[in-house]
């Protein structure tokens, strides 16, 4: 596992999530004041990056117009990726 600064556009987010808008607003305030404190988790498979958590952090960062996100990147097998896509 490694922690990296990644372009938001490079992360595939295949699952639709329901956002708590109040939580996104609080995160926007905190991120603009203190920066991103907790990385999201990303799976890397065959050169592609897949994000399955951190939807509120990602939404806050996108709405702030920031181009990158801090992420813990873990290599994944095809089986691991399939499990997350269910």
Which sequence ranges carry the predicted segments?
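Short, charged/polar connector segments at secondary-structure boundaries
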Residues: 1-75, 79-86
């Amino acid at each position: 596992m490694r922690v990296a600064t990644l372009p938001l556009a490079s992360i595939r987010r295949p699952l639709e999530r329901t956002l708590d808008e109040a939580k996104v607003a609080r995160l926007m305030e905190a991120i603009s004041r203190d920066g991103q404190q907790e990385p999201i988790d990303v799976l890397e498979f065959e050169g592609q990056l897949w994000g399955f958590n951190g939807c509120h952090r990602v939404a806050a960062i996108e709405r702030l117009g920031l181009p990158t996100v801090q992420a813990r990147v873990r290599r994944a097998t095809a089986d691991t990726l399939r499990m997350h896509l269910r």
